[in-house]
């Protein structure tokens, strides 16, 4: 797990000691449409010195009817290369909530291994009163980013329908209990709420320490959380959520405990909930 995380004090020291290193810090903060605000405005109000903003919408598939879907390798390479990320660049990602694991998963899916998440993210950085910048960052020099085609770590609609109908893997859903149960809106206009038959609700927030830490829980604690929700860690797992964002948190924690047999359902509920032929359940109020 330490291979994919960097602590705030470590990053602060690196930025001061070696500011010219082949390193790019990316703020990937993002809001659900129902929030009615844009994360880029928060970035302009304050960000880690030298950081650049990566827009989750911009780095997703522009032609998909579903939000936050993986783009082509060429599209991903164009966006991140334009932010100054090259083949050997160390990428450090952070946000103000729950998005960093999605970018961690995307970079890995496209073949980039030099990727770390700032443990505790922007909230911990600010709580510790570390240096911040405001406004726009300096323009980045575009680099060539050699993205490879996505491999086996992605589950598609037909894969998940097969699992729902015939088994073969556990499906774990990272959304809040209220969204999963269908007692709260999906978060996306026009998309019904509820859950897939057989899915296990495993809320993403259980994998973070409370304020003022905001850090990921330890692998030992993560294993306990999975056990509390009855997740079978002996077989394959598919992670899902509203639109493939917090599902990556579950995947990150599965990797942390050594469970590598997992895939992320990229369309997640935004796709499943809109499909006319998928089974959708709700729990009684």
Protein language model features and the residues they cover:
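Cytosolic catalytic domains that perform sulfur/thiol-centered chemistry
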Residues: 1-285
């Amino acid at each position: 797990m330490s291979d994919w995380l960097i602590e705030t004090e470590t990053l602060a020291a690196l930025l001061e000691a070696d500011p010219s290193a082949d390193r790019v810090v990316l703020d990937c903060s993002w809001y659900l449409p129902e929030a009615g605000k844009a994360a880029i405005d928060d970035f302009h109000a304050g960000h880690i010195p030298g950081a650049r903003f990566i827009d989750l919408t911009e780095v997703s598939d522009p032609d998909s009817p579903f939000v936050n879907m993986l783009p082509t390798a060429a599209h991903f390479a164009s966006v991140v290369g334009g932010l100054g990320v090259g083949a050997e660049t160390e990428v450090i990602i952070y946000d103000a909530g729950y998005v960093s694991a999605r970018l961690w998963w995307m970079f890995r899916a496209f073949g980039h291994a030099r990727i770390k998440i700032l443990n505790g993210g922007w909230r911990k950085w600010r709580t510790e009163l570390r240096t911040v910048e405001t406004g726009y960052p300096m323009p980045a020099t575009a680099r060539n980013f050699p993205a490879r085609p996505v491999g086996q770590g992605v589950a598609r609609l037909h894969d998940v329908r097969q699992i729902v109908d015939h088994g073969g893997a556990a499906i774990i859903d990272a959304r809040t209990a209220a969204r999963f149960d269908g007692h709260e809106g999906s978060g996306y206009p026009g998309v019904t709420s509820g859950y897939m038959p057989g899915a296990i609700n495993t809320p993403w927030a259980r994998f973070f320490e409370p304020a003022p830490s905001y850090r990921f829980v330890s692998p030992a604690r993560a294993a306990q959380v999975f056990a509390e929700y009855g997740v079978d860690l002996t077989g394959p797992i598919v992670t899902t959520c509203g639109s493939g964002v917090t599902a990556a948190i579950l995947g990150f924690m599965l990797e942390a405990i050594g469970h590598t047999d997992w895939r992320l359902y990229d369309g997640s509920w935004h796709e499943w909930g809109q499909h006319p032929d998928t089974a959708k359940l709700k729990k009684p109020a």
